[in-house]
Amino acid sequence: MFGHLFVRDSEIILIDPPLVPGLVESITRMGKPKAIILTAQNHIRGSKYIREKTGATVYVPDQDQRAVEPQDAQAVKEVDQFEKYSTGTGNLLGFEVFKDFYDFALLTDHKELIIADNAKGSADGELLLYPESVPHDPVHPANETIRREFKELVKKTGAVTLLAGHGYNIYGNLQDLADRL
């Protein structure tokens, strides 16, 4: 599992931050965390702790509740203070918000697509979509709807890089890999 950190005008924005020892101290050496954005409600990870230590605002996606496990919904409630966002939110702290199946995707101004769980790179540079991205024997391929929707998302956003929540990132050739789906 990964998180991402963006520094914008000396303000720090965390995307799906993990809960690891020393993270808050390391981040605050660079600046004051302004926000924590979750791409899926099950990515709550270190959000509550980081918010309590830094005062950063937590943004939680307004997900379809059929895609949210009860324990994840409870963990979000325990964050206590958060803002909900959706595709109608518009620009969220410099990120464009898009729907990605039941989760949300964020697009940076450098055409980097930040995805929760539905896509990732493999060690050999291939693009994997859920559920093929989860180790199974035999491999469970992604269905055609998932492939088509992801391909359309990449094309619509113009994204060239995938910043994945799990697995490997894909740098520079996301359009080409999505075209091959």
Q: Each predicted region: which residue ranges?
A:
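Active-site HxH/HxHxD metal-binding segment of metal-dependent hydrolases
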Residues: 19-87
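Active-site-flanking structural segment that lines cofactor/substrate pockets
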Residues: 1-7, 12-26
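Metallo-beta-lactamase
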Residues: 12-14, 91, 96-180
